[in-house]
Amino acid sequence: MTSSCSLSRPQHLFFFFFLFVPFLSLGQQISVDINSAIWEFPSNPLCLSQQSNFAKSSQFSKNLDSLVSSIPSLKSNTYNFYSLSVGSISDQERVEAIGICNRVVNRVDCLNCIAQAAVNLTTMYCPQHRGAYVRATKCMFRYSDKPIFGKLETSPVLEAPNPSNATGDRNEFIRLQSELLNRLRSMAASGGSKRKYAQGTDPGSPPYTTFFGAVQCTPDLSEKDCNDCLSYGFSNATKGRVGIRWFCPSCNFQIESDLRFFLLDSEYEPDPKPGNDKVKIIIATVCSVIGFAIIAVFLYFFMTRNRRTAKQRHEGKDLEELMIKDAQLLQLDFDTIRLATNDFSRDNQLGEGGFGAVYKGVLDYGEEIAVKRLSMKSGQGDNEFINEVSLVAKLQHRNLVRLLGFCLQGEERILIYEFFKNTSLDHYIFDSNRRMILDWETRYRIISGVARGLLYLHEDSRFKIVHRDMKASNVLLDDAMNPKIADFGMAKLFDTDQTSQTRFTSKVAGTYGYMAPEYAMSGEFSVKTDVFSFGVLVLEIIKGKKNNWSPEEDSSLFLLSYVWKSWREGEVLNIVDPSLVETIGVSDEIMKCIHIGLLCVQENAESRPTMASVVVMLNANSFTLPRPSQPAFYSGDGESLSRDKNQINHIASLNDVTITEFDAR
């Protein structure tokens, strides 16, 4: 502690006494005090008018009282969903009830909220009604004398739209919001019988950069009923507002344009393990006494070392707290991820790189995820982990993959991404059969999307970033084959006004074949490093071959040299994938992309265009392109290329392998 916060010795004794006294309560059952919790409830009763009243002396009244009074003693669960009943199924006086909380509410608060909602509903809002429904800010409770488990109910409706109308293109605003909600609807509906919930973000419509959405159904519903309920809500809710919350008994949703009004998903604490309460109390008491004695004996040493330990705590700030505070991401425990990936089964493995393996996972409520488990042997686990969490979580663009969450437990470093069943571009473009799926329209869309994503990283995001590992395997494809740039483990952050400048590193990491010569040889990197990698990728997409490919007639030429030689000799057909030539020939658009690719892979970094120029060139119908100079590592007779290759053959083989730290020459 600093001098301004120091305590005298008597104060220390009282401080530590009161610090340890609370441990006496360890192991005791958590009591639910419905009077101490403060929740916001609607002032108007939501009694179901079609259901008649009951007499206070009736069996239904007794059953309802029994049900309500039992809620505080329920064992809380991590799913925040409770279904209760009193009375036999054939009994006309049977009461059925459902309580559910928002996903962001912790389980103890959830039970508090439902308990108070039940009391308010039966004593204040709808006394003696045989059916009623109430929605608080964090929970919902409903009961009925009719069967309600697994039954879709869309009435009554509560709607809370933001009073502000959207500005900009209203139709585009509504369309993009609908796309996000419909995507989340499918995810939530496919959840299990314990949770039907999904949340996510999508790029917004200017001037709104991001849309934040969350949808939820009571998990007793079938997949069809959940879909129908949310579809009904989407159709009937007020359109064109900057934010809205919509509720009915069976489902609810929220969509916002401002993160300040959107609660991110929280992680739940595990259920307490069963044990002997008396033993726990005895152990806690003994520990408290021993702890108090130790503190009293060594108080002097604590006080003298106080300033130093405070500094150490500050410098060694817990990485987990840093990730949660800075990134505001969903954090999952290791056991949840191990279950989702079938204990990291090889059948679930999607790929493997220099930093670890990627697995497909399915969470217990049905959401598919991609799990990147960083290798503890890579030597860069923490560095890559911090890079991806701190950078990617704050980036929002339709052509960048979204980081959903993370796990930090012991030595485990795990990143959780949105899952794409189409996997990555390299699975298509380098496969002779799958490549046929990629017509020119799709390939051009991929080229343009990657260009826009890199432009966002270099110039348009709040953080200016050089990716440093742009390649086909780091371009994921969504259901519509739109590209998403992935893997930011080696990305570097620049100051806003420094993206045009050059930096140096003594530890070069990346994939040979995509590396710019100045980066591979001397560790020099800038935005032009990514431009070079993009140019290689463009030529791979057009030719349908890896950058280490050689023609049968001349094994000394690799892709860049072959393209340059064919371009200079006017043999453009040699540069284009035969499947494209058969369908559309060599169009002006293909010629333009070849030209842009060659401009990007020029040996001189200053001659390469910026990504802003690339995007302009791709979108322009008539644009005079500058003449490209020869690409890096080119030699017509192959000698220069061989010499350059031998000079850096310690980096990696010509295979598409990401390599980690090595000293640049």
Swiss-Prot record:
Modification type Phosphoserine: residues: S473
Segments forming a coiled coil: none
Entry GO MF terms: ATP binding; protein serine kinase activity; protein serine/threonine kinase activity
GO cellular component: membrane
EC primary class: transferase
Cellular localisation: Membrane
UniProt entry keywords in alphabetical sequence: ATP-binding, Glycoprotein, Kinase, Membrane, Nucleotide-binding, Phosphoprotein, Receptor, Repeat, Serine/threonine-protein kinase, Signal, Transferase, Transmembrane, Transmembrane helix
UniProt membrane topology term: Single-pass membrane protein
Glycosylation sites: N120, N165, N236
Transmembrane segments: 281-301
Alphabetized InterPro entries for the sequence: GNK2 (IPR002902), GNK2_sf (IPR038408), Kinase-like_dom_sf (IPR011009), Prot_kinase_dom (IPR000719), Protein_kinase_ATP_BS (IPR017441), Ser-Thr/Tyr_kinase_cat_dom (IPR001245), Ser/Thr_kinase_AS (IPR008271)
Family: Belongs to the protein kinase superfamily. Ser/Thr protein kinase family. CRK subfamily.
Protein name: Cysteine-rich receptor-like protein kinase 41
Biological source species: Arabidopsis thaliana (Mouse-ear cress)
